[in-house]
Curated annotation (Swiss-Prot):
Keywords: ATP-binding, Nucleotide-binding, Signal. PANTHER family: IRE1-RELATED, NON-SPECIFIC SERINE_THREONINE PROTEIN KINASE. It comes from the Eukaryota. Belongs to the protein kinase superfamily. Ser/Thr protein kinase family. This is Inactive serine/threonine-protein kinase/endoribonuclease IRE1-like. Pfam families: Pkinase (PF00069), Ribonuc_2-5A (PF06479). PROSITE patterns: KEN, PROTEIN_KINASE_DOM. Coiled coil: none annotated.
Amino acid sequence: MWLLAISLVGLLVVVVCVFLRFSKDKGLDGIVNEKKRDKNSAPRVSASGEDGTKNEQVEKKSDPSGGLGEENEKTNSESKVLSVPSDQNINKTLPVMLPSLELRKYDENETPGKVVNRRLLVSTNEMKYGRNGYEVFQGVYGRRSSVAVKCLDLAHTTEAFIQNEIDNHCLCDDHSNIIRFHGLEQDQSFAYICLEPWKCSLDDLIKLSVRRTKRDTQAVAPVDDLEKVMKRIKFWKEKGKPLPLTPMLKLMRDVVCGLAHLHKLKTIHRNLNPQNVLIIVKDMTLTAKISDMSLSKHLGGKKSSYKHLATCSGSSGWQAPEQLNKDKKKKEDFPADMFNFGCLLHYAVMGTHPFGSPSERDTNIKTNNKTNLSLVTNLEAINLIEQLLNYKPDLRPSATQVLLHPLFWDSEKRLFFLREASDRIELDITMWGDLNKTIAPRVLGESKDWASKLGKTFITHIENLAQAQPGQESRQYNRSYKYWSLRHLLRLIRNILSHHREILDDPKIKEMVGKVPEGLDIFFTARFPNLMMEIYAFISMHCKGEEAFEKYFN
């Protein structure tokens, strides 16, 4: 009887030891793998942009013996271990070891998290916005206060896929508009990519903005930090009140700056969509940063482009025609990113996709059917979007050219351009006829009467200034104007910008126009919405190569 008792005790000890061993090595993986995956199904690496999913999937399973597990720091020499390229100066020093391998709390309100390699703490606090289909948790990496930890299941993701993302981050992320890569950790089950934390994605931001615009309060999530930011920022113009370089356009300019940096380094992103643009919030200032370099391609060596890959790149509804048509004779190059940016810009400006609903986008892109382009009313935006969505890749502007477009000029630059255009036109009488005959009807309308658009109060003030007071000489900026002449309208804008303290000294006029330059820009843009692009095209045709306009075109 006593022999049976000893045997049962021994068996119980073995069971307890096995259970403890399992809990230490495997149990915590549930923190970053909450939903059990079907091993027989095609593995999901990530979700795509606004609605679709990535067409490119990876199916190779990693060797379970590989990695840098907490209990297996000495790995098999034959196992593949992901690494940061040694020639990249990303982490000059290895992150400091955490004090203990035991579980720690991310903060007082959180349950214990998982420690990886004594350097990374992965909390159980999953990030609410900007995950793009991945499992992303808040974490602490070494002494860094906070990182976003992108968790990739090694059973469903190849080492090559992850290594490509790491290599591209190391090559390209030294820029204010590319999400920063802080490091890589790995255990037997997961690879952990440590990234700069963010507030939300551009997709989250636009959808929340659209809901607020439509006052669909029932669909809005409970108030959080993101909504607090949204309430204080006007992302789009109010009806009838144009806001040049609105916060949303500033975010779009951030994206172009990031693309220009990638293209300068001969890297194609290949998957630009609203979910892959992340928003950083600091002191109520928003910055857009490009993320997800997993499908990016570096054009190394002497090659400037590469043929279409065997599997389609990018996300459904957010691919260029050359990416969708699978024409091996055509090359996927930087213009593909610019087409994607054109779709992104339309989505940011209007809250809609230029090629329609999710189910019809790919077909419309293939057939060049821009169903929603007519919804755009801003002429600067229409002009740029049409160029970016050109079916022929060679006719799309580059990222550096897009940065020079008037859509991304601030009020001061817009007014300075009109002033220099006015000075140049005044010097060349041969330009007057073409300006008033061809351009004026599109700017002023058939009546060619710009005085009526400015209002009686404003015009009366201008006319009073033109009449010299007794004993005073009439100054040049007080000369009378011909209200049918577009050249004289440009002269008026030029004079107000150069002498606004004298011309806008009347309190009523100052209140009407607002501050210079923002208020003055809005005042004239609201009344003559075609003015900027028409004069821009006119000067581009006649004076583009002149030194005075070099900063606007080159």
